[in-house]
A protein has these predicted regions:
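Helix-turn-helix DNA-binding elements, focusing on the entry/boundary residues of the two helices
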Residues: 16, 27, 38, 53-56
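The alpha-helix within a helix-turn-helix
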Residues: 20, 31, 60
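Hydrophobic micro-packing sites on short alpha-helices
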Residues: 55-60, 70
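Short alpha-helical DNA-recognition segment
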Residues: 26-42
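Short, charged recognition helix plus adjacent turn
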Residues: 72-104
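A short, Lys/Arg-rich alpha-helix, primarily the initiator
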Residues: 1-22
């Protein structure tokens, strides 16, 4: 069975929504601060729209969080999701048949 790919836009949307909620902001408040339509922000948060670099910069500024921080959290979340769904492989020694790595 093929592993479902983690989409960047979905991971980004989850991080942006979590940050907005952590700050206690409504979509309407964030929309006003970022000067981006409420509907578009909602679609970005749900992973339905790709955020341009300009839009992402506006959202980060409105959320008072650095772009690098957002991208690092998104990257960490993607890596964690990929690891959680990665098949477990146990390489064995070439001649001895001894296990040289474990799944732990």
């Amino acid at each position: 069975m093929a592993q479902e790919a983690v989409l960047f836009r979905e991971a980004l949307g989850e991080v942006l929504r979590a940050e907005r909620m952590r700050r206690g902001l409504t979509l309407r408040e964030l929309s006003g601060r970022a000067r981006i339509s409420l509907g578009y922000i909602s679609e970005v948060e749900r992973g339905q729209k790709e955020a341009s670099s300009e839009l992402l910069a506006s959202l980060c500024e409105a959320l008072e969080i650095g772009l690098g921080t957002v991208l690092r959290v998104v990257s960490d979340n993607i890596v964690a999701a990929e690891r959680a769904h990665a098949p477990i492989t146990l390489p064995v020694g070439a001649n001895s048949g001894d296990v040289v790595a474990s799944a732990a």
